[in-house]
């Protein structure tokens, strides 16, 4: 039955977009199309990746973990359905769930570690008031089953029928605010209720609400590690969401529910998931018509009578700074009750953002995958500056800057590989904003070092490495960095000496291999920065540390091996290089061991020479399952291998890069819910596809080289700023013609298998002749 419902939903999505796609699928020749002629957003399917299902993924990490709701490019607000609180369901939604518990105004995209946000949960209901959410397939509450065939998602828009209440819900968003439209049945006891304590992966620990006038409420939701959230509290996430919400129907019969949390009660994720939590919240105290209320677990509701198909709307602005900021955000963006106008503006914002890459050729399915991938790369790092320029600093104080937009959610270990190098091409100002955000965070917090996984000013310590240094070095090498570089270098230097190979020439267990190799790479980044800034002594110091990867290599085992602090290798496992977690983070040595992007010649020499390395790579790919789900070989579901297909370009066999990059594009990405083989990871999984489908990829951020591979499309036009366009034209490109026969750059024969960033950014045309068999003479110089 579930498969049939899914098929019907997919057919419905295809039917509703086929006319738009037909208009988009014009010939590749002719003048460049304008945004007015084309709705790039019609190619976006937000259901791609929108599942946390571990069974379908074949691994505990689950699938894409994206959300299907409404948002805008890099917007603060995401108005999205939530189907679950708790577990490792960071987006708050999973497609196979059969009930919805409400529509939140903040979400995270594609993450594990239990997630966070999911604040300001709004739910329309009818009948008796229920103050507990209930459980999927279990305890009853205010949640509702929903009609799967009615579910619709587009860029900036979401719609569904809540079948238990027979209420149609629609959502749209602006950058700092959002709007919900509910179509009610005839009922004397209709209602909109807001669960102010709700939070993905936990609970808000304190809330306040006040009635401003007969259409308006405002309040705040304080979230601390004591309430779980990011890493179930281990991520040190501490933030306050302020909201300013208005109802189209006047507040007459309204109230607050409050739950008395027992003194000393642990409020982490396990408590929120427990039956005791449902019992406690179901027995909440009701206070009628209070002007203001504060407490540890609150909700607000307004009741009214509705006629048949009566529309009732709610709009809200949020802020991480103040109530006044939330009010300004709403009033600046949504001035009236015209839902369709807000939706239209959201669509227009997406059309403009997505127009930065215009592809032609390929199939409609491939275009949907491409533009949905591009869409997913434009969710984070999101804005957390209010419309008046204020942002919450890492010192807990409001700040204002005229020189940058404060941004948040930096999933560093993931996004330094593809997402940030992609943005240096299509959104370089955003990369600069991110670096300024991380630098001011280091300054305001007093820590004066860079965080590796930032969420709303939290030094979460999630994952490993020093990815902010990679982004900094990459941006500086590309000439797009407008920081105080002396300050930035000082913070980067401190970061490298706090977390690196300084003390022993390697980093001991746990995760000795992953840490040593990742730190060696960012120590190379430091050497490049130091050299560029004229710090020759530092450059030599870090260049030596960048060779630390050699200190873990065991030639007898033909493998990197983790060392203990006393210098001894950890015992060799029975599974050898395939043993997951053997000195590695979420992977094995076969996968992590290729991560020496800054010294590929040195790595090749260490591993026995070019022929042996090519043979090892060939074996790895040949043993990889064609569905690319979690596996012990080329595991595309996890980031450490994302550069590996492009290593062939460095080994004199670029045709194998062309073969495998194209094959991965075809097999690991699909236009369906299960269309991402692993977590989206805040844009990284999708950025890989965008770059590879364009025929480009950066093996070593910090170096300005982009590998040339096999484009998916016949023509790709990238807007690179200052009125420049870089075009990648793949003549005779078909599913069979995946190999480059020859190339021209701006009309001149081009024999290299890579481009420089500057070649791309000054605009021009890379013209590739494609064929069905490898040309083993092209690109080997």
Residue ranges and their predicted role:
Residues 3-15:
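Bacterial N-terminal signal peptides that target proteins for export
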Residues 14-25:
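Bacterial N-terminal signal peptides
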Residues 33-470, 476-517, 530-551, 557-558, ...:
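Accessory carbohydrate-recognition regions in carbohydrate-active enzymes
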Residues 522:
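ATP-dependent phospho-/nucleotidyl transfer catalytic cores
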